[in-house]
């Protein structure tokens, strides 16, 4: 236990909280341009072809972002909106593209959980 004098001379160090999404720079979302759109395979024990894209953000960061939902219209030079949120079985993927914003279209024929995939309410 430190004495009062020791604490006066050198206060206790504040704990530094490290961000899980440093490229967002404390913003909720960031805009960026796709530099590469491709598929990659997840870690064991999962098996799939996950759709991801490399995005150059407006602040100069280049990040890998997951494209959720079935099917997408993204290609190189598409402008996308990026939010935080990692994909547990894809190492290095710490961001998601926002569906239904900018050049990224919503998911076709999506009926449930529409808000997460940029789909308007269907005409009853």
Swiss-Prot record:
| Gene name per UniProt | rpsL
Family the entry assigns: Belongs to the universal ribosomal protein uS12 family.
Q: Name one GO biological process term.
A: translation
What's in the GO CC field? small ribosomal subunit
Coiled-coil positions are none
Q: Which GO terms describe its molecular function?
A: rRNA binding; structural constituent of ribosome; tRNA binding
What this protein is called in its record is Small ribosomal subunit protein uS12
Q: Which UniProt keywords apply?
A: Methylation, Ribonucleoprotein, Ribosomal protein, RNA-binding, rRNA-binding, tRNA-binding
Q: Subunit structure, per the record?
A: Part of the 30S ribosomal subunit. Contacts proteins S8 and S17. May interact with IF1 in the 30S initiation complex.
Question: Its domain of life?
Answer: Bacteria
User: What function does the entry list?
Assistant: With S4 and S5 plays an important role in translational accuracy.
Q: Which InterPro entries match?
A: NA-bd_OB-fold, Ribosomal_uS12, Ribosomal_uS12_bac
Q: Which residues carry this modification: 3-methylthioaspartic acid?
A: 89
Organism of derivation: Aliivibrio salmonicida (strain LFI1238) (Vibrio salmonicida (strain LFI1238))
Q: Kindly list the cysteine pairs connected by disulfide bridges.
A: none
